[in-house]
């Protein structure tokens, strides 16, 4: 499996580089977040052996089961939390994750700020924007995103560095990428986490700094 994952990583990286160059951007301006959710630690280790270092997990509990041992072997790995975060998992998330991409409500932001103050660890945070205003999804609606950014950054004191979105499956993602880019521009935020296996090249055209790719690297979920 190691050879397959290494080949997949190289293929995705080539596509990222080509998309960046087509958009007039430097290839190294786009970070590939390899989404390892539901895949075993062995698959992550194969990606690490191939030289990749940035990974994304949806659930703190799953990340706790995989990443402490991997970090011992590869201390330069970076772990992004890309799934919804419950307030009762905040302490674990701050301790384990290097970036938290899914800040989406004041109560969570306040809990994160308290834990960062307590622990002295301040992982960069992104605010998740529900660009499609889908009731079943987490994320702040675009209509209140500007105010929420100000609240998190200025009143609560979180290290907000950018925005993240997951467009609706049945809509043209470019519209959502453009919207996220505009909200980030208004607030002076530099990081844009958007684009997945099916649409990351389009996201790069709209300014993505981080693309979250799982299936194109590790295969269908849980295949390992």
Identify the role of each PLM range.
Residues 1-191, 196-206, 220-221:
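Conserved alpha/beta-domain cores
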Residues 208-224:
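Gly/Pro- and small hydrophobic-enriched strand-loop and loop-to-helix capping segments
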């Amino acid at each position: 499996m190691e050879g397959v994952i290494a080949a997949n990583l190289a293929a995705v990286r080539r596509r990222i580089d080509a998309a960046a160059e087509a958009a007039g951007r430097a290839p190294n301006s786009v970070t590939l977040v390899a989404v390892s959710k539901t895949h075993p630690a062995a698959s992550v280790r194969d990606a690490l052996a191939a030289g990749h270092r940035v990974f994304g997990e949806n659930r703190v509990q799953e990340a706790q089961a995989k990443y402490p041992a991997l970090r011992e072997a590869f201390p330069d790995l970076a772990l992004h939390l890309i799934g919804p975060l419950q307030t009762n998992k905040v302490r674990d998330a701050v301790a384990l994750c290097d970036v938290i991409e899914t800040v989406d409500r004041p109560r969570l932001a306040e809990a994160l700020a308290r834990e960062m103050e307590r622990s002295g660890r301040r992982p960069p945070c992104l605010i998740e924007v529900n660009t499609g205003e889908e009731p079943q999804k987490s994320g702040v609606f675009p209509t209140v995103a500007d105010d929420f950014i100000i609240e998190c950054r200025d009143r609560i004191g979180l290290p907000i560095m950018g925005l993240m979105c997951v467009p609706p499956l049945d809509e043209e993602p470019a519209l959502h990428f453009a919207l996220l880019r505009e909200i980030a521009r208004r607030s002076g935020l530099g990081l844009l986490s958007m684009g997945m296996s099916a649409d990351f090249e389009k996201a790069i055209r709209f300014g993505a700094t981080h693309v979250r790719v799982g299936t194109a690297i590790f295969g269908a979920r849980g295949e390992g």
